[in-house]
Amino acid sequence: MKLIEQFENCTLPKEEWTHENHFVVALWYCIKCPLPEAIQKISNGIKKYNESVGGQNTDDAGYHETITLFYTSAVADYLITRKITSVTAEILHDFLQQPFLKKEFISRFYSQEYLMSKEARLQWLAPDKN
């Protein structure tokens, strides 16, 4: 898949590193790798890519651990509950329609202040909303 190759090689144009493409990358790794390995590839890949386009991964910018793990868990749940083991055009189309891809989805589980805290960026924090 071209997106994955460009992501891994840090040749993906910055404007193509969209919210949606973050999810496509997560979907790919969650299908191709055991979950712990997928999480590592996603996390390390985002950090590496951010730096390759001039970004920094600090306690107030760049990679965000809680957001990454939250959404990777949602992707894994989607795959497991539907017994998906490969990516097809049909699966990708359905995946991209899922409610958890909407940017505001995470706000059902996290307050903005808590999610944007230094601690949440640097390490996993469980949701603060019921």
Positions of the model-derived regions?
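Conserved, aromatic- and glycine-enriched, well-ordered alpha/beta core segments
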Residues: N9-I84
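Intrinsically disordered, low-complexity serine/threonine- and proline-rich regulatory segments
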Residues: M1-C10
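A charged, amphipathic interaction segment
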Residues: G62-N130
